[in-house]
Amino acid sequence: GDMLVDVDASPEVASSVSGEGSAAIIANTTVQAILAVNALLDAGTPVGLILEGEYAGDYVVSSDSLADVANRFVIEATKTDAVPPAKIIKSGVKVYVPGALPEYSSDETGREYGVKNYRNLLNNSLAWDRFALEKQMGFALAASADEADIIVGNGALSEDEAAKVAQGKPYVGYGSVAVSSIRDAGLEVDCSLDDGDKPTKSGDFDALANVKFESDSIVTVAYAKRGDSLFYGHGGAMMTKAPDAAARLLSITNDPFVEGFMTADHVEKYKGSLQAIDCTFEGWNAVLFANSLTNKAYQLHEYRYLAAAIYSRILEGDFAL
């Protein structure tokens, strides 16, 4: 028979809301949940990040505040009268993305020339971060590190920005450039792109692999509790040094990759490698990932790692209805 069917309309999708009660648990399963949380925070509605138990890594709000976001976004929510332990996510937070180039080029005398911000039109990695954070996840961006609550991105930190992070400014960095900036700021961490004695252009490598969850963490629990170990990273980098006090979050398993663009030598080094750490000690307040989280703005599967890392740095008091 004819197996082809005419498609003349997009499928209808809607939120799933079950249960009864004064509180609503928003499952942290998609980017739509992040958008819903940020929309609620923008409206001044209290949102809690659940820290433990069955709903760890999910979000809690009052049931009265759920209807608007359930209609605007496609989310999964469960109503209940039992409010799980949660911390309030700070509202009004601004995120600064580092890595912008100067507005103009300059010659050896310091004289500026060129078209204003032309080079940043070609600054793809900066654009991916900004687009992913603002447009795809709903975070508000800041024009400078000074006016931001947190610094987030794959770009190199300036000397002043790195000093702020070293002094405790919240930071989420990903990729070898970002990790190297923190190393240069004084954190005992290193990120390698080389195949040992055979340096390569491994910054162009990527892999869709499986990860081992090395420790319990609010950054990773939404994936860990659902058995979602798939993890994409562009860059091919590996954390070859980490502070003893850092919490080890993710490492690549020895399983065959689902997809990989790497030399055979690099594959063997990449397997078992450390990919993410949480540095909350001695004044540091940072989460670091060895590889990309926003590459080409298509890594939506990894965005919940990024959002959870951001939220984990900006928690306030206990959530209560």
Enumerate the language-model features and the residues they cover.
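Intrinsic-disorder/low-complexity accessory segments
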Residues: G1-L321
